[in-house]
Amino acid sequence: VTTGCQRYPYDPEKATRPYPSQLAQGSLADIQVIPNINGGTLKLVNATAVSYSNFDLWMNRRYVRHVDALPAGQTVELPIDTFWDERGEGPFPGGWLRYYDPTPVILVQIQSGPDTPLVGLIAKPPDTDKR
């Protein structure tokens, strides 16, 4: 559900829980996160020998989505418009027909359990915008 006066993409039915600020980031994984502005996606490049499964992916300490699997040595692309916050607001995804600049991707973290430390990922600059 989107209306003309909304500042952000908004769907109250997609509201999630708040960012787990009580959890520390315990480690940093060699997984690059590259925004694709024209495609409105996040590319996750797992350069490690570790597979991750059944986790929540946090973006900018605000938006979250569930990810089924990120296999070792593989790349996964996720639509940015599948991330939501606790109010049911989403980031601006980009794309050719966008009205606003895409939400910058600053911090990306894996949460594998409710009480486990977060795993930080490497946020890279976006793919070149050739719009």
Task: Identify the residue ranges that each predicted region occupies.
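Intrinsically disordered, low-complexity Pro/Gly/Ser/Thr-rich segments with frequent PxxP/GP/PP motifs
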Residues: R61-W96
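Bacterial Sec signal peptide processing site at the extreme N-terminus
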Residues: T2-Q22
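Terminal connector regions
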Residues: E13-T16, W84-R131
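Short, surface-exposed binding/anchoring microloops in extracellular/periplasmic proteins
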Residues: L23-D68
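A short, structured loop/turn motif at beta-sheet edges
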Residues: A47-V50, P71-A72, S112-D115
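Generic hydrophobic, helix-prone segments enriched in Leu/Val/Ile
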Residues: T2, V33-P35, T103-V108
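Extracytoplasmic
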Residues: G39, Y52, G73-T75, T103
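Beta-strand secondary-structure signal
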Residues: T41-K43, D56, E77-P79, L107-Q109
